[in-house]
């Protein structure tokens, strides 16, 4: 069975690739962050949510949010399935998304992808670790589809 975005096993597969690409992530720096990836439906409601924890240079945990009572994310990254799929399709094709479709660019505009957080200082971790998050997603180009 092939792991699919945003399943926890998909993020755990990225974590194994992250381990293999250790030097890249060591150059980016230590990342300690807890976040949720949310796929939003056309009605604005969460369709799927996965809790992910980066612990240093590795994915320490990934689990469906419904199976993680008490998970306290620093932020939640929200986008519709077409937005996520466009980014992942570009990564599969080119190894990275087009510049205007990166996590950073999309969050800056805030229309197609946005952040939610109850604490501005914790939300700031998104910007602090943005390149690590993008490189983690870029590893998805190495996963079977």
Model-assigned labels for residue ranges:
Residues 1-145:
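Feature captures hydrophobic
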């Amino acid at each position: 069975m092939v792991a699919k975005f945003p399943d926890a096993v998909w993020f755990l597969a990225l974590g194994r690739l992250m381990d293999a690409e250790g030097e890249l992530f060591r150059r980016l720096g230590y990342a300690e962050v807890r976040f949720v990836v949310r796929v939003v439906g056309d009605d604005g409601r969460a369709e799927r949510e996965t809790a992910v924890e980066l612990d240093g240079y590795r994915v320490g945990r990934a689990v469906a949010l419904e199976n993680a009572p008490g998970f306290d994310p620093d932020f939640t990254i929200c986008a519709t399935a077409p937005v996520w799929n466009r980014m992942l399709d570009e990564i599969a094709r080119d190894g990275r998304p087009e510049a205007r479709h990166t996590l950073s660019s999309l969050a800056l505009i805030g229309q197609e992808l946005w952040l939610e957080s109850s604490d501005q200082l914790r939300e700031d971790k998104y910007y602090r670790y943005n390149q690590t998050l993008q490189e983690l997603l870029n590893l998805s180009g190495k996963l079977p589809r």
